[in-house]
């Protein structure tokens, strides 16, 4: 209450509770028998959670509950559906204001981590029970293409289903469950220090696992948030907030390292503070050399920000990753006179970026780090 939920609430964040199956999951060989005949218990458990933690109660610690995290195709599907129905109905009875979130799911064949929306959540009786479709997506290459099964690439890369997974989910939602929200509750990139990379062990050494650089982690996280903002999703949560500098998948995915900010921490903080009150408006340009998105502050069309970046990058298995690839670019047909240009922040200070502005155009350096171009209000 105080040390976990309270700190996030005081920071202005909402909390989502995940009812993990844990040792009652598929890793327990007797898990099916353990759940047999427990429908009433599932209902009461859901009701108790909602009553205590929910926004209608005294504690007001959470606003949503996810029913297990990643049961995937290893967890018996009819059993999961039964648990979901009972627990969701209990949550509704305990606090109808709580948003009920599915486990991780997507609109194609189930895998080790995600259920198939078309199978697990297509029944109209289940659709009416949930409010949010939960998606995990990583810019990972298909297994077998590289020595490591955990190789990741930049967000716009053509050799990953990173964005395709989300588009498929949106299409399924629009057709079968209109009105339901979509939350991306996991995405991210690992970046550890060279010192620990030299001491990899186990399969991470044998299969030559590699993360991205600290700068690339910042670039790819910000670009991911920007890309997600242009899609019909409601929320996106990065994974993870802190790491212990471990050279393994998910072991160095924090935006802080042992509690100390990485470049990605400053970049995400800047995005939050700079565009937090803005909303995606349109794609101005989108090609192999330039992504240019427009954001408006609320419904005020006079407060405009363009965000520009080069949609290029490196795969994590590439041993040599150049830190700075840039080119000069000129943009025309501007909405008004340029006011300021901010570089992506990677330290404690936000840095203005040089530009040359003439009548109706602006010239500046474009790189893989997004820049924020603000305009003066229209006269």
Describe the role of every protein-language-model region.
Residues 61, 84-117, 161-193, 233-245:
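Aromatic-lined carbohydrate-recognition surfaces of secreted/lumenal glycan-active proteins
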Residues 1-149:
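Substrate-binding cleft and catalytic face of glycoside hydrolase catalytic domains
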Residues 330-350:
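Solvent-exposed beta-hairpin/edge-strand motifs
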Residues 286-335, 370:
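Carbohydrate-binding surface patches
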Residues 49, 65, 87, 133, ...:
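Conserved, mostly hydrophobic/aromatic
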Residues 352-379:
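C-terminal beta-strand-rich structural cap/linker in extracellular carbohydrate-active enzymes
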Residues 188-271, 282-291, 302:
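Aromatic/acidic polysaccharide-binding cleft in carbohydrate-active enzymes
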């Amino acid at each position: 209450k105080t040390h976990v939920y309270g700190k996030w609430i005081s920071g202005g964040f909402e909390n989502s509770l995940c009812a993990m199956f844990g040792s009652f999951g598929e890793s327990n060989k007797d898990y099916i028998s353990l759940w047999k005949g427990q429908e009433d218990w599932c209902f009461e458990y859901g009701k108790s959670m909602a009553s205590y933690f929910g926004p209608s109660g005294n504690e007001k610690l959470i606003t949503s509950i996810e029913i297990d995290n990643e049961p995937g195709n290893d967890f018996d599907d009819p059993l999961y559906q039964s648990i979901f129905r009972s627990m969701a109905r209990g949550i509704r009875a305990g606090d109808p204001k709580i948003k009920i979130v599915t486990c991780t799911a997507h609109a194609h064949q189930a895998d080790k981590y995600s259920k198939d929306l078309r199978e697990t959540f297509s029944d109209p009786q289940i659709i009416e029970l949930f409010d949010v479709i939960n998606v995990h997506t990583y810019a990972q290459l298909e297994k077998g293409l590289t020595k490591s099964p955990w190789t990741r690439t930049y967000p716009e890369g053509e050799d990953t289903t990173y964005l395709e997974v989300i588009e498929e989910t949106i299409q399924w939602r629009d057709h079968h469950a209109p009105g339901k929200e979509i939350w991306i509750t996991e995405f991210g990139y690992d970046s550890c220090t060279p010192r620990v990379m030299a001491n990899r062990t186990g399969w991470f050494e044998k299969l030559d696992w590699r993360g991205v650089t600290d700068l690339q982690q910042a670039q790819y996280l910000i670009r991911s948030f920007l890309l997600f903002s242009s899609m019909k999703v409601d929320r996106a949560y990065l994974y993870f907030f802190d790491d212990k500098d471990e050279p393994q998948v998910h072991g160095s995915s924090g935006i802080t390292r042992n509690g100390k900010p990485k470049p990605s921490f400053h970049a995400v903080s800047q995005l939050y503070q700079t565009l937090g009150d803005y909303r995606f408006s349109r794609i101005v340009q989108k090609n192999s050399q330039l992504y240019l998105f427009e954001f408006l502050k609320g419904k005020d069309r006079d407060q405009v920000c363009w965000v520009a970046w080069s949609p290029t990058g490196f795969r994590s298995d590439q041993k040599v990753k150049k830190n700075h690839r840039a080119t000069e670019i000129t943009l025309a047909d501007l909405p008004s006179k340029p006011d300021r240009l901010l570089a992506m922040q990677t330290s404690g200070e936000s840095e203005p970026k040089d530009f040359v502005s003439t009548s109706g155009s602006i010239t500046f350096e474009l790189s893989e780090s997004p820049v924020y171009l603000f305009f003066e209000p229209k006269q």
